[in-house]
């Protein structure tokens, strides 16, 4: 979807990538304006790696699926270009190699797990294998967060009052986008909420497979 007469509006992008064991990997991309209204939304069909891909990509498989295949496709479809794109899984950060936009992984400040690790807000005690807290919406719809993380030395990190942001160290200038977030509306909003919208939309587009 895309709204009319929005080309001059400053926008903020959110990409959520989730996984279901029986269906594969899903991605959704939501762009919002200064009052958090949707400007564009795009989502993917499930992406299920082949056995050959699982073997050949090894531990880099989730970066390939989440970043190169899913996030790259989503961001390339958009008509609008946001000031920054926030992602909810570190495996998505590698899309930065193909997209000339600041890409930041966001989580609540003080989340467990060091840099990276932790979560984007929330109070659920359920955790993924990466240590990230899964939102109630993710759990309700059977989604898991991709667990891949690089070595901590490959990330650059910066904190604001309520959030921690990570990017790939080779693109550490992306952290300058936090200044725009601080100076604009964005940091005053719950940065988790747009991800929840994406997950709800993904669950509508791709219902859970019913047990036989």
Name the predicted role of every residue range.
Residues 89-108:
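Short Gly/Thr/Asp-enriched flexible loops that form oxyanion-binding sites at enzyme active sites
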Residues 42-43, 53, 74, 104-106, ...:
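Charge-biased, low-complexity intrinsically disordered regions
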Residues 19-22, 88-94, 171:
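Gly/Ser/Thr-rich loops at beta-strand to alpha-helix junctions
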Residues 110-139:
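Intrinsically disordered, low-complexity terminal tails and inter-domain linkers enriched
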Residues 25-81:
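A glycine-rich, hydrophobic loop/mini-helix early in the fold
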């Amino acid at each position: 979807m895309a709204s009319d007469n929005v080309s001059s509006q400053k926008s903020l992008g959110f990409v959520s990538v989730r996984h279901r064991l029986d269906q594969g990997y899903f991605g959704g991309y939501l762009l919002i304006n200064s009052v958090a209204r949707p400007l564009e939304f795009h989502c993917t069909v499930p992406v299920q790696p082949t056995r050959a891909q699982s073997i050949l990509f090894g531990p880099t498989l989730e970066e390939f699926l989440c970043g190169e295949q899913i996030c790259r496709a989503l961001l390339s479809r958009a008509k609008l270009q946001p000031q920054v794109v926030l992602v909810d899984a570190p495996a998505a950060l590698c899309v930065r190699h193909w997209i000339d936009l600041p890409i930041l992984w966001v989580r609540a400040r003080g989340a467990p797990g060091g840099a990276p690790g932790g979560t984007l807000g929330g109070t659920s005690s359920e955790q993924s294998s990466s240590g990230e807290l899964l939102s109630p919406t993710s759990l309700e719809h059977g989604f898991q967060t991709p667990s891949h993380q690089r070595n901590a030395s490959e990330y650059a990190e910066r904190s604001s009052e309520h959030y921690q942001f990570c990017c790939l160290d080779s693109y550490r200038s992306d952290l300058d986008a936090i200044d725009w977030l601080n100076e604009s509306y964005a940091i005053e909003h719950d940065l988790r909420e747009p991800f929840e919208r994406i997950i709800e939309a993904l669950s509508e587009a791709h219902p859970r497979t019913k047990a036989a």
